[in-house]
């Protein structure tokens, strides 16, 4: 089964929350504490704190200390893709052992494999879909593009359902 890890899901939720915050001071985006985000969405605070720290280290967030501290976006949400966020939290997205994220393969059966090429197409379709969804799209929910026909067809071949929304 293909699904986002809870960490990636929580990271996307936090970035959406921050993208929707009204601007404060000199910043285009408002800030929120880890506790506020955790309480709003029922996410465990210790886990969310680790995710937010990871997103800050990856350059997606700025951490601000003090009484009005918290996290705010460090980059324009129109330029942050779901794929970048998922990679920052979970590492490379690898559908099967047939190949790595960058096209190599790590399977002893690849010479005789009859599903390698269709799986490669599904893998590429998923990466393409995730790279075309931005935090701004997720925040607006109107801008989510439909998966391209090739990605949908490849996914159907394996009984997967690709939808643009992250529900």
Task: Describe each model-derived feature in a short phrase.
Residues 39, 56-57:
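Alpha-helical residues within the helix-turn-helix
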Residues 77-102, 115-124:
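Conserved segment of winged-helix/HTH DNA-binding domains
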Residues 46:
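Key DNA-contact positions within bacterial/archaeal DNA-binding proteins
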Residues 100-167:
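C-terminal regulatory/oligomerization modules of transcriptional regulators
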Residues 52-53:
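Short, hydrophobic-biased segments on the C-terminal half of alpha helices
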Residues 2, 6, 12-43:
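N-terminal helix-turn-helix DNA-binding core of bacterial DNA-binding proteins
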């Amino acid at each position: 089964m293909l699904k986002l890890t809870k960490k990636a899901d929580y990271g996307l939720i936090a970035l959406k929350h921050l993208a929707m915050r009204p601007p404060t001071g000199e910043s285009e985006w408002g800030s929120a504490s880890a506790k506020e985000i955790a309480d709003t969405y029922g996410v465990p605070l210790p886990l969310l704190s680790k995710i937010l720290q990871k997103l800050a280290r990856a350059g997606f967030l700025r951490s601000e200390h003090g009484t009005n501290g918290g996290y705010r976006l460090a980059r324009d949400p129109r330029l942050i893709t779901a794929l970048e966020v998922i990679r920052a939290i979970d590492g490379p997205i690898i559908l099967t052992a047939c190949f790595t994220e960058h096209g190599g393969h790590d399977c002893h059966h690849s010479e005789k494999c009859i599903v390698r090429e269709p799986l490669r197409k599904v893998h590429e379709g998923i990466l393409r879909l995730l790279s075309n969804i931005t935090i701004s799209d997720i925040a607006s929910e109107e801008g989510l593009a439909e998966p391209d026909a090739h990605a949908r067809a490849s996914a159907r071949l394996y009984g997967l359902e690709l939808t643009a929304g992250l529900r």
